C-alpha cells in the first residue's frame, strides 16, 4: 500500500522538530531522498512512497532520536561547493571552516604557493576544495585516523583530484618531515575543544570522533605541539589555522611566547567570532 509523500514529510518533520527544530523539514527531505537514492529535487516528482520505504524512514528516524548525526545517516555532507562522503569515525565538515578556505584561497593567489600541507585531513573537505580550485598545487595531507584517510582518499577520487593530493598517516608534520617534503603553507582545522566544553556539547557532536574534537584541558594542545615543531624549522612559510573563539587570546599568547617575530592576522566567521588565524614566519 502506498502512502502520500506529503503526509510522510509532514510526519517526519513533526518528529524531527523534537531533535532539530530549525532544520526539521530539510532533514525530512534529505532522509526521503536518501531512502529513494535520489536528490532532494526528485522527491517532489513523485506522489507516493511504498510501505517498505516508509519502514526504512522509521528506522532512520530512530537513529536520529538516538543522537546519530544526520550526515552519518545519509552518508554525505555539502561543503563549500562540493558534496562529500562521510561516515562514523570521521569529523563532519562545518560551515565555519569555509572561512579557512577563503583565507587559504586568497593567500595562495597572492603568494603563489604551490606546496601545501594539511594537518588533520578528515573527510578531505579542505584539501579537495583547494585542489579543485587551483590547477598547479600539490597538497600533502595527513591524519592520525586511518578511517579519515580512507574517506579522504575516496572523496579525492570522486572529485578527480587524487593526483594533486598525497595522503600520509601520522601526527602533525612528522610524516612530511621524515620524507623531507618541502612546503610553503600549512593549513589545519585541528581539535580545539577544551575539557570544560564537553559537557555542554550537543548530543550529535558527541557522536563524532573524540580525537578530532578534543584539544586538551584548555583546547590549545595542538597549537603548542605545532609551534614547538615549527620553532625548529626556521622562516619563510605561512600557517592558516582554525580556532575556537574561546581560545583565540590564549593561542595568540602562546604564539608570542614561542616566537619573537611573526605576523599574525585574524579572521571572523559569519557570526562575528574570531575563527581563523594566519601566521607568517618571515
UniProtKB/Swiss-Prot annotation:
Protein family: Belongs to the protein N5-glutamine methyltransferase family. PrmC subfamily.
Catalytic activity: L-glutaminyl-[peptide chain release factor] + S-adenosyl-L-methionine = N(5)-methyl-L-glutaminyl-[peptide chain release factor] + S-adenosyl-L-homocysteine + H(+)
Gene that this sequence comes from: prmC
Gene Ontology molecular functions: nucleic acid binding; protein-(glutamine-N5) methyltransferase activity; protein-glutamine N-methyltransferase activity
Protein's organism: Dictyoglomus turgidum (strain DSM 6724 / Z-1310)
Residues binding substrate, per UniProt: 189-192
Any Gene Ontology biological process: translational termination
Name under which the protein is recorded: Release factor glutamine methyltransferase
NCBIfam families noted in UniProt: hemK_fam (TIGR00536), RF_mod_PrmC (TIGR03534)
InterPro entries: Bcl2-like, DNA_methylase_N6_adenine_CS, HemK-like, N5-glutamine_MTase, PrmC_N, RF_methyltr_PrmC, SAM-dependent_MTases_sf, Small_mtfrase_dom
Tagged with keyword Transferase: yes
EC numbers: 2.1.1.297
Keywords, in A-Z order: Methyltransferase, S-adenosyl-L-methionine, Transferase
Positions with a binding annotation for S-adenosyl-L-methionine: 120-124, 143, 189
Name of the top EC class for this enzyme: transferase
Its job: Methylates the class 1 translation termination release factors RF1/PrfA and RF2/PrfB on the glutamine residue of the universally conserved GGQ motif.
